[in-house]
């Protein structure tokens, strides 16, 4: 697709990746990031948060698996120190815990432009009412996928949900599609740029249907490089609307300073 000159971009925090996607993630859109364990999914999200906070944007990290302490330690080891942004209010971390907790969240007074199914989901999850959004821990057992909206303040500009796949378990394919579509549309209506990290197990379990809901998709792999015989990390960008992209696989590494892209390798690996 031809790139749009009017599409604003949000830098990814990974310089060479920005060059591959027209300057960054499309602003106000949802991007799906999938991959098996060990491919660096969380690190991609940390790069985005560090860059966006450095640019003065209000950011939210919704963590469904790792603790804030572990995430902050991981970011610090890569030179992406996030603590100052927590202190000055540019970053907030919402941890979704498997504990009992009180009702949480915030208002989302938007129904214009949504279909009946989406409006039903919004009302079912009480997104049309006002709630607190300052609670630290949340009950993943009773939390709905669309409840993610409730955790995001009105002034947020960039959100990373890591791992949205955790919230997909227990849903059938139609339920997941309806809820994920609604979540993505509500956040896009608020002009929030979102990266949805999704583990490969949940991605396959939901028949890869999340690809159809988001504006873009980045897939991470660990495969044997036939030229070197070594197991290496690759990424592909099969979809990025309003952006001119290459379908070649891109070799990358995780270094002491985070993600480093090493160049395109064409279609040299079998990702099946």
List each model region and its residues.
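C-terminal regions of RecA-like/P-loop NTPase motor modules
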Residues: 1-4, 244-272
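Dynamic helix-loop-helix/coil hinge segments at AAA+ ATPase domain boundaries and subdomain interfaces
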Residues: 3-11
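Pre-Walker A adenine-sensing motif
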Residues: 12-24
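Short hydrophobic/aromatic beta-strand immediately N-terminal to the Walker A/P-loop
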Residues: 30-34
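Conserved P-loop
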Residues: 36-130
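Loop/turn-to-beta-strand initiation segments
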Residues: 58, 89-90, 155-158, 189-196
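Phosphate-binding/switch loop-helix module in NTP-utilizing enzymes
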Residues: 99-188
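Phosphate-binding/switch region of NTP-binding enzymes
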Residues: 192-258
């Amino acid at each position: 697709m031809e790139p749009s000159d009017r599409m604003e971009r949000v830098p990814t925090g990974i310089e060479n990746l920005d060059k591959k996607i027209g300057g960054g993630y499309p602003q106000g859109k949802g991007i799906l990031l999938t991959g098996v364990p060990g491919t660096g999914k969380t690190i991609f999200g940390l790069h985005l948060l560090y860059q966006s906070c450095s640019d003065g944007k209000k950011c939210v990290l919704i963590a469904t698996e790792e603790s804030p302490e572990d995430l902050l330690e991981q970011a610090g080891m890569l030179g992406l120190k996030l603590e100052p942004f927590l202190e000055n209010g540019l970053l907030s971390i919402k941890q979704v815990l498997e504990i009992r907790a009180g009702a949480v969240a915030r208002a989302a007074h938007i129904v214009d432009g949504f279909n009946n199914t989406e409006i039903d989901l919004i009302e079912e999850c009480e997104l049309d009412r006002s709630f607190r959004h300052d609670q630290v821990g949340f009950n993943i057992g009773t939390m709905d996928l669309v409840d993610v909206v409730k955790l995001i303040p009105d002034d947020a500009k960039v959100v990373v949900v890591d791992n949205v796949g955790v919230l997909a378990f227990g849903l059938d394919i139609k339920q997941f599609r309806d809820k994920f579509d609604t979540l993505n549309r509500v956040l896009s209506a608020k002009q929030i740029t979102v990266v949805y990290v999704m583990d490969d197990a949940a991605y396959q379990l939901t028949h890869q249907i999340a690809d159809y809901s988001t504006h873009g998709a980045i897939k991470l792999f660990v495969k044997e490089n036939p030229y070197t015989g070594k197991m290496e990390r690759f990424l592909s960008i099969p979809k990025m609307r309003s952006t001119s992209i290459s379908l070649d696989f891109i070799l990358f590494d995780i270094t002491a300073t985070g993600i480093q892209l090493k160049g395109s390798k064409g279609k040299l690996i079998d990702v099946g």
